[in-house]
């Protein structure tokens, strides 16, 4: 993202888009449309939260209400529990969308590749919105992009290191490291498949909370934590 290059006109367009989404009669949508709708809503709200507080070095600097995730993960801050907008007369937070709607209702671990938390360690924010027609293809594309990038998984002399997403949400990936490995192999390209072949478990996990800002000079991963 190039947050510093977003114009006032662009911000107004984003506000109008969010207003349009907030006025949608969600119950009138079929399940596939709802799935795409909530992904787009989450990502647009995240971008707005960053733009409203930019410049910041990390989304964790935006102290609006923390997160459902433990404070040792998020630093106890962030915008995730703040009620940022109303949908159908009900105030909604980012955590509501991810943990009370998307994950429990759709039960698809590819959600973790679709929702973007504005950090270098998170999956890529695709340039186009999700639609009912494109949903499955875009979810698969997002999964492959992440699994086949060092942000998702990498190997070195110490063993196999994966994104902390697979630790935080391990229950969504089979409930153990073997389930995570099976998931990774499902979306791995030939090179990643070969890299994964020697491993039967995961050595460490890592996550980079730096803002996914193209203006940032650093794009390095943080030191891994033990898995």
Language model features by range: what are they?
Residues 1-227:
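Interaction/scaffold regions that mediate signaling and macromolecular assembly across diverse proteins
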